């Protein structure tokens, strides 16, 4: 694994509050967790976007394969592969994600939960087509988001955040450690 082979993806509204190994046994990690707040709508939307190729139909299977993380490594090659399989171009995929961002903030999208998780779509794709090349880790990856941050009033100095990101001295420490 090299750093240039992967995108490091983190949600924009996340405050780093815990360390996660993004690599295990020389393979990128796909995180999965179950959460009562998770909605089947993610799956329905992904199923529509991929013509049913990445669909999960039973609740039991959904719980066992519920991929989501606030930060994760996306392999560039697999991202290109996935976009090429389900979309005509990168531009079409970007338009799709922009429209998704717009729709998710509308009242009817909130009501019907018609939006997509890039983490779930990517993870379902990798699990289906590259399962032997990843490590699947069942863990609670949730970080403190902007709403929890304001409630908890936990703050990090710029220096502390910089140290968390850059620390490569200690095994397993540092958010960007490969």
What are these regions (language model features)?
Residues 1-6:
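Active-site nucleotide-sugar/metal-binding loop of Leloir-type enzymes
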Residues 8-10, 176:
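Hydrophobic/aromatic beta-strand patches that form the interior of the parallel beta-sheet core
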Residues 11-15:
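The conserved acidic donor/metal-binding loop of glycosyltransferases
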Residues 17-110:
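Conserved catalytic core of nucleotide-sugar-dependent glycosyltransferases
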Residues 93-178:
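A glycosyltransferase accessory/donor-loop signature
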């Amino acid at each position: 694994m090299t750093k240039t082979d992967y995108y490091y993806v983190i949600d924009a509204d996340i405050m780093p509050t815990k360390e996660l190994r993004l690599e295990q046994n020389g393979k990128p990690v796909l995180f999965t967790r179950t959460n009562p707040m998770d909605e089947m709508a993610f799956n329905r939307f992904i199923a529509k976007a991929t013509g049913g190729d990445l669909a999960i139909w039973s609740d039991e299977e959904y719980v066992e394969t519920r991929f989501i993380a606030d930060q994760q490594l996306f392999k560039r090659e697999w991202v290109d592969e996935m976009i090429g399989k389900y979309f005509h171009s990168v531009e079409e995929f970007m338009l799709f994600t922009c429209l998704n961002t717009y729709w998710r903030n509308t009242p009817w999208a909130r009501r019907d939960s018609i939006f997509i998780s890039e983490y779930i779509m990517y993870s379902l794709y990798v699990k289906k087509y590259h399962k032997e090349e990843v490590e699947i880790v069942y863990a609670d990856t949730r970080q403190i988001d902007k709403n929890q941050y304001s409630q908890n009033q936990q703050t990090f100095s710029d220096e502390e955040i910089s140290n968390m990101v850059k620390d490569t001295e200690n095994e397993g420490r540092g958010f960007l450690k490969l």
